[in-house]
Amino acid sequence: MSAPRTLYDKIWDDHLVDEQADGTCLLYIDRHLVHEVTSPQAFEGLRMSGRKVRAPEKTLAVVDHNVPTSPDRHLGIKNEESRIQVEQLAKNAAEFNVEYYSENDKRQGIVHIIGPEQGFTLPGMTIVCGDSHTSTHGAFGSLAHGIGTSEVEHVLATQTLIQKKAKNMLVQVDGQLPAGVTAKDIVLAIIGEIGTAGGTGYVIEYAGEAIRSLSMEGRMTICNMSIEGGARAGLIAPDEITFEYIKGKPRAPKGEALEQAIAYWKTLKSDEGAHFDRIVKLNAAELPPIVSWGSSPEDVVSVQGIVPNPDEIQDETKRASKWRALDYMGLKPGTKMTDIAVDRVFIGSCTNGRIEDLRAAAKVVEGKTVASTVNAMIVPGSGLVKEQAEAEGLDKIFKAAGFDWREPGCSMCLAMNDDRLKPGERCASTSNRNFEGRQGFKGRTHLVSPTMAAAAAIAGHFVDIREWN
């Protein structure tokens, strides 16, 4: 009888082509997502060596990082560098026979949102993309992670990837989530607990009552930020919630093929007694709404908390780092989080740009008005999310409250397009990174859930969504 295996072990074993004596492995890749930023050199490498894309049907390309989200984007991209990257992806996709969603295709959107929407992402698969937040797709019980540009070329040419196996970590989140606490708060709490290096060398499996209770959108939020916890990937075993989400998606199996697939997908779970190299446990019932205060995703506190004092940190290097973060953020120790005013609010990104996120934000802002001191924007994660939101009238709620309603794209998650912070501006953001300059030169980012961001837009400062009226 074989030894008990984790979910990660099972997917790894199913895709192992070859293993060298030193542990270097060759993995087969089932799905390859491509965007305009990390692919130009890879396609050029194929061109120079006279190679073709080995499996175009397992490859999907979309523009997301550089595209404007303004209503007039159909008139063209003004920034020359961005325009060239977008045009080059269109050219490369056509030349190498790869399916491509342009900025004018309603299926276009952030790469990690369109994959699941199309049924391109399925349980048990190996999925890669030249983007660190590829871990998002692990919510389906797939092994998904980012790769570098040279690896993008390797996968395009061979449909394989050279890897060494990571260790197994289990993050068990038991208990029921209190009202006002979301998947975003869970993952920020996890990163606050283990630190941004806590997952280094690991693949994380998320489990427990609180995780099982989440929708697919919530699970994608959790897995999305695995990389912020230092992990190679994050995954959640598929279940009936997963299967229901997949049914009817354009590229998903149908009929008897779907039944056969589900029978296999039901085996994708860690065996009883499987070995994990590290186990972390959290009680969801004790989690508050969370806000980041510094320039690292591990810099988090309860919304009812205060900005911490770095002098209480014993490690000299870490203490200096946290003082630098406070200086950059323009904050002082002891400041109440609810006393921090915001200039901008961004609701969107591959972390929180799905229909469930927009519905939650709309409930908070309906009948209210954005504070006069705040500029707030809603950026749907894809054209299909935007279409669904408009069918439900969410756009009207946001516009009536004073939010900008934008076209889909990565937008203000990163300063690679027209949506960015000005120096010194403070933003409540539903994205995944609060690094220095991430949203714009000298911009200050606070990571929060969609409901917390929406409430901050109305109040003009952070508020406890549990007490929001």
Curated annotation (Swiss-Prot):
<feature type="binding site">
    <location>
        <position position="350"/>
    </location>
    <ligand>
        <name>[4Fe-4S] cluster</name>
    </ligand>
</feature>
<dbReference type="InterPro" id="IPR050067">
    <property type="entry name" value="IPM_dehydratase_rel_enz"/>
</dbReference>
<dbReference type="InterPro" id="IPR004430">
    <property type="entry name" value="3-IsopropMal_deHydase_lsu"/>
</dbReference>
<dbReference type="GO" id="GO:0051539">
    <property type="term" value="F:4 iron, 4 sulfur cluster binding"/>
</dbReference>
<dbReference type="InterPro" id="IPR015931">
    <property type="entry name" value="Acnase/IPM_dHydase_lsu_aba_1/3"/>
</dbReference>
<dbReference type="InterPro" id="IPR033941">
    <property type="entry name" value="IPMI_cat"/>
</dbReference>
<dbReference type="InterPro" id="IPR001030">
    <property type="entry name" value="Acoase/IPM_deHydtase_lsu_aba"/>
</dbReference>
<dbReference type="GO" id="GO:0003861">
    <property type="term" value="F:3-isopropylmalate dehydratase activity"/>
</dbReference>
<protein>
    <recommendedName>
        <fullName>3-isopropylmalate dehydratase large subunit</fullName>
        <ecNumber>4.2.1.33</ecNumber>
    </recommendedName>
</protein>
<comment type="subunit">
    <text>Heterodimer of LeuC and LeuD.</text>
</comment>
<dbReference type="InterPro" id="IPR036008">
    <property type="entry name" value="Aconitase_4Fe-4S_dom"/>
</dbReference>
<comment type="function">
    <text>Catalyzes the isomerization between 2-isopropylmalate and 3-isopropylmalate, via the formation of 2-isopropylmaleate.</text>
</comment>
<dbReference type="GO" id="GO:0046872">
    <property type="term" value="F:metal ion binding"/>
</dbReference>
<dbReference type="Pfam" id="PF00330">
    <property type="entry name" value="Aconitase"/>
</dbReference>
<keyword id="KW-0100">Branched-chain amino acid biosynthesis</keyword>
<feature type="binding site">
    <location>
        <position position="410"/>
    </location>
    <ligand>
        <name>[4Fe-4S] cluster</name>
    </ligand>
</feature>
<keyword id="KW-0479">Metal-binding</keyword>
<keyword id="KW-0004">4Fe-4S</keyword>
<keyword id="KW-0456">Lyase</keyword>
<comment type="pathway">
    <text>Amino-acid biosynthesis; L-leucine biosynthesis; L-leucine from 3-methyl-2-oxobutanoate: step 2/4.</text>
</comment>
<dbReference type="GO" id="GO:0009098">
    <property type="term" value="P:L-leucine biosynthetic process"/>
</dbReference>
<dbReference type="InterPro" id="IPR018136">
    <property type="entry name" value="Aconitase_4Fe-4S_BS"/>
</dbReference>
<feature type="binding site">
    <location>
        <position position="413"/>
    </location>
    <ligand>
        <name>[4Fe-4S] cluster</name>
    </ligand>
</feature>
<keyword id="KW-0411">Iron-sulfur</keyword>
<keyword id="KW-0408">Iron</keyword>
<keyword id="KW-0028">Amino-acid biosynthesis</keyword>
<comment type="similarity">
    <text>Belongs to the aconitase/IPM isomerase family. LeuC type 1 subfamily.</text>
</comment>
<keyword id="KW-0432">Leucine biosynthesis</keyword>
